[in-house]
């Protein structure tokens, strides 16, 4: 028997297929998000990799920002619960999970048995999320995947003071116009994310 897990996120859809021996036999990630049928494409890719069809799936669980788009699933589970179960399955003994998604960020504290003890989410729009980093990459004229490499070349630390993504974008544009380097701004963006996540870690206990 095969089991299907689908995560319909705000910026991408992820699929994993597991057999009855608890082995992950196929995965797929499609970067399109909830406004499309990206999860169907991801499922097709995973089915092809595993050499199976939907008829071979015994049970399906869906999670994520857009999980309501897949009502055919046998069960819908929150991202918080899925994070806890997935991390506990892959790495025993983990007590803290940090998830920086496209639209929100979460810090999850686990109990000794791997269940959720507490969690906190970001409070200010897209601040501290993947969307914030996407905006920073766009302003700096690079791909999101290139942002960390750019930050590694910084020669000083700068602070991005605005917590709102819209205002932070304006602040970064002003700094660049004033002569600040893209490398230093990229590092500042990473530091801004890190500080916000660390604040969440403090609140989760």
Roles of regions detected by a PLM:
Residues 3-41, 45, 116-119, 123-124:
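Short glycine-rich, Thr/Ser-proximal phosphate-binding strand/loop in the N-terminal lobe
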């Amino acid at each position: 028997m095969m089991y299907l897990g689908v995560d319909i996120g705000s910026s991408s859809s992820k699929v994993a297929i597991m057999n009855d021996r608890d082995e992950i036999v196929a995965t797929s990630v499609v970067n399109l998000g909830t406004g499309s049928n990206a999860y169907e494409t991801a499922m097709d890719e995973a089915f092809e990799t595993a050499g199976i069809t939907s008829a071979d799936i015994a049970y399906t669980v869906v999670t994520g920002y857009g999980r309501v788009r897949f009502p055919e699933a046998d069960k819908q589970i929150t991202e918080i619960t899925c994070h806890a179960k997935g991390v506990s399955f892959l790495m025993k003994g983990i007590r803290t999970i940090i998830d920086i998604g496209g639209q929100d960020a979460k810090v999850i504290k686990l109990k000794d048995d791997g269940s959720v003890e507490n969690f906190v989410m970001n409070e200010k729009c897209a601040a501290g999320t993947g969307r914030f980093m996407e905006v920073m990459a766009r302003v700096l004229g690079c791909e999101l995947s290139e942002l960390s490499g750019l930050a590694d070349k910084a020669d000083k630390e700068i602070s991005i003071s605005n917590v709102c993504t819209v205002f932070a974008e304006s602040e970064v544009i002003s700094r660049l116009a004033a002569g600040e380097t893209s490398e230093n701004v990229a590092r500042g963006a990473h530091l801004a994310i890190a500080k916000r996540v660390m604040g969440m870690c403090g609140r989760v206990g």
